Amino acid sequence: MQTMYQTMNDAELAAAIDDLEARVAEVKARELKLDMARGKPSPEQVAISRPMLDLLSADSDLTDGGVDCSNYGCFEGIPSARALAGEFLGVDPSQTLVLGSSSLLIEHDSVAMCWLKGTCGHAPWSEFSAAHDGARVKFLCPAPGYDRHFGITEDLGIENVPVRMTENGPDMDEVERLVAADEGIKGIWCVPKYSNPTGDTYSDETVRRLTSMKT
């Protein structure tokens, strides 16, 4: 999926650079001091969780389900945290993993491991192109979606393929058509509950079709 600038010739790129530099200079001249970070909760929202800072002390019992949480803990995450996640997600705690606080880091590591090592005994994704006459590995990207998800696959050289996002999740007719016809498609970026940025939640039918479709 080419960007707008990748489709431009040299003259068009030069003109675009001049235009952007002029616009940047105009904004800088205003001497604004803006926080452009995205997704930051308001101070009021952060304040809701502040009482948690007072729950533990050096004398607190840090054992949870037989796990010493002051030490390395366990791979799946501490039991009470998994139970809480299961409650939020509406699933049994045994179906949850509680890892680091950054979902983006977990997603990056998962895709990078597939790229380097493959899945379930299959060849690494990085070897796909050489074995298929130069065809690229692809990832479906429901749009609008989270650009930093798309940046992970793009950074690895994976081709992002946009799929229309609906209020019930990705357009499953299009998803099923694409994956049935192209073995280079290895995955799809999904935020099934409160999708970023639309806030939509995937319908039960969308989830069923995602988990049962032929690839």
Give residue ranges: language-model regions.
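N-terminal "arm"/small-domain region of PLP-dependent enzymes with the aminotransferase-like
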Residues: 2-76, 80, 86-87
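Conserved core of the PLP fold type I
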Residues: 61, 67-215
